[in-house]
A protein has these predicted regions:
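Feature for extracytoplasmic/surface-facing segments of secreted or surface-associated proteins
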Residues: 28-240
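Generic detector of short alpha-helix boundary/capping microenvironments
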Residues: 15-16, 58
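N-terminal export signals
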Residues: 16-20, 51
Length: 240
């Protein structure tokens, strides 16, 4: 498996914690926010080395970097859910954390977000940007049933489109490392042409997933207006 290297991006915020060889800076979510840890792996068929990880939560935010195996871990005061962006070289991937625990950032989480955004009647860009303030989106991304159903839908589409059965449909929160589990799934998807050179799912696959998400949401557009909207359902994270 080939690996790619990216420059370490440092972000200065209040407070700092040194984790192994990676620099981490976290901004607390206020005195009432609990201290929690979010960890996982960033990969696209190869681990993202020294990738810059940015987390923006309902309350609190943090930055860290991935190690040589694409793994990251950050402990800070926050209230979920959190949007997560991983950037390294030409590759940028997105994911989310319902709360503390293991969450991965992969081409599969890009598809998961496409499905959930369409189900909510919005776009991935809008979903992530408004997640810290929009109650509808927060509810949707902190409900285990909705997330599990969305993961299952994505897994089914991949099976039907490419004949690939994922090692686990719970790909958001299932821990993995280089050469096993979800990492092998990503290798197969890249070989099948489901993932492009930037780590993003190809347009045809994204369109199929988005169409399915829209159908699951019944064409809802209620979450796209006003940060204080209510309603929707979503999922919870798991700890490794």
């Amino acid at each position: 498996m080939n690996r790619f290297n990216t420059p370490v991006i440092r972000c200065l915020q209040y407070g700092s914690i040194t984790l192994a060889t990676s620099a981490l800076f976290a901004c607390g979510g206020g005195g009432s926010s609990p201290n929690g840890t979010i960890n996982g792996t960033v990969a696209v068929g190869a681990p993202m080395q020294n990738g810059a990880i940015t987390l923006v939560c309902k309350n609190g935010s943090a930055n860290t970097t991935t190690d040589a195996g694409g793994a990251f871990s950050v402990t800070f005061k926050f209230d979920g859910p959190c949007s997560i962006t991983a950037a390294g070289g030409a590759i940028t991937l997105h994911s989310f954390a319902p709360g503390a625990g293991t969450v991965n950032i992969t081409s599969l989480t890009e598809l998961l977000l496409s499905y959930l955004a369409a189900q909510l009647g919005t776009t991935v860009t809008n979903l992530l940007a408004r997640l810290p303030t929009n109650a509808t989106y927060q509810n949707a991304l902190t409900n285990s049933t909705t997330i599990a159903n969305a993961e299952a839908a994505v897994a089914t589409i991949i099976k039907n489109s490419y004949g690939i059965t994922l090692s686990s449909s719970a790909f958001l929160t299932t821990a993995f490392s280089v050469g096993q589990g979800q990492d092998k799934d990503l290798d197969l998807l890249m070989a099948a042409g489901a993932i492009d050179a930037t780590g993003k799912p190809v347009a045809t696959l994204t369109t199929t997933v988005t169409t399915a998400g829209t159908a699951a949401g019944g064409g809802s557009t209620g979450g796209t207006q006003g940060g204080g909207a209510t309603g929707g359902t979503g999922g919870t994270g798991t700890t490794p």
